[in-house]
C-alpha cells in the first residue's frame, strides 16, 4: 500500500504538491530527500518544453523525457561560465538565491540514483555520454564533477572522420540501451568537435495487465484524411477515470509496478491544443483529486514510440540559452578553447504492451440488461504522461498523433488475429 500512500501525498495540494514529505520519521525534507527540492522547477520546465515542441511540430508525434533533459542541461552548466551558466540554470527554473549550485547538483545526483535503482519488473536505461574530438582534453574538474554528480561517460573520437565517428556513437548508444535506440546519427556534421548525448529507454510492467488474447487490429484516426491500423489492447477493470468538466477531455490513470504511474488523456476531437495549453502542475493536481474508480472497458494502442531532439537549437528558440552560439562560453569543459558546443542530443524511447503483474480479466460478455461499464477508446491522437511518484519526476511527456511512426527496432506491432469490427471514418470514431 506504500505506492498508494505516496500517490496521495504527491497530489495532496497545489501548495504542497512538490514539497510534502513522504511517509517517514525524518521531517527534514532537504536532508532526507534533496531531489524533491528540484521537483517544482523540473515539472514547470517539463511542461514549458513540451508545449514548445508541440507548437513547433503540428500534426506530429512529440515524445521527451523532461527529467532526463533537465539532468543533461544541469550537468552541462558545470562547464559553462559567466552569463551562459546563469542562463542555463535560470532556464531550468532555478534561483541561486534559494538553492546553491552545489545543492542543485547534489539533488540531481540523488535523483539520478533513485531513478536508476534496480527494479526487476521494468526496463529503464538512462544516461549521458560525451563524445569529444581526440584533439581536445577535458578539464580535470569538469571530468570529476560530471562523473560524481551525473555518472557521465566521456569518450574520444575522430570527428574529421564523421562516418567512423557516427558509427562509434551509434554503436555505443545501441549497446547501452540493449539495442532499443539505434542509428541516432546519420547525416554528416564535419564541424562537430563535441557532442553530448542524453538517452533514456523505458518499458514497464502494469499492476493490472491487458488481456493478451483480446488485442486486435483496429483503426486509429490520425486525422480527417489518414487512418492507420494499430494493435489495440484491451482490459475491463475498475480504473481511475475522469470525464473532465473543465477541459474537453477524458482520462485514465494506470499504475506500473514500482513507483511509475501513467496518465492517458483523450481530448475531444479538434481540442488537443486546448488541453495541452492547460497542462500544468495545477491541472495534474486537479485531475488527481477528481479521478474516481470506475468500471471501464479500456482500449489503448500497443505502442513503441521515440523522439530525438537537438537541444542546442531548442533552448535558443525558447530564449533559455543558445548553446550553439559563439556568444556562449563553455571554457570550463576542455583545456583548449571551446567557444560553443556542437550538439546536445536527447533521445527518449518507450514501449507500451500488455504485460502486467496480475492477470487481466477475460473479455467481457454482457448477459444481463444491467448498466455496463463505460467504454473508452484511444483511437485518435492522445496525450501520455508518465510520472515517478516517489521522486515526483516527469519521466515522459508525449503527444501521440500516429502510433505507427517512430517504432523501435524489434517492436512487434502487427498481429495475425482478425481485426475487431469497427466503424469507418474520422467522424465515426468514438
Swiss-Prot record:
Protein name: Corticosteroid-binding globulin
Main location: secreted
Compartments reported by the entry: Secreted
SMART domains per the UniProt record, alphabetical: SERPIN (SM00093)
InterPro entries, alphabetized: Serpin_CS (IPR023795), Serpin_dom (IPR023796), Serpin_fam (IPR000215), Serpin_sf (IPR036186), Serpin_sf_1 (IPR042178), Serpin_sf_2 (IPR042185)
Similarity remark: Belongs to the serpin family.
Glycosylated residues, chain numbering: 119, 175, 243, 259, 326
CDD domains per the UniProt record, alphabetical: serpinA6_CBG (cd19554)
Keyword terms, alphabetized: Glycoprotein, Lipid-binding, Secreted, Signal, Steroid-binding, Transport
Annotated tissue distribution: Expressed by the liver; secreted in plasma.
Organism phylogeny: Eukaryota, Metazoa, Chordata, Craniata, Vertebrata
Entry comment, domain topic: Proteolytic cleavage leads to an important conformation change. This reduces the affinity for steroids.
One function term, GO molecular function aspect: steroid binding
Transmembrane stretches, start-end: none
GO cellular component, one term: extracellular space
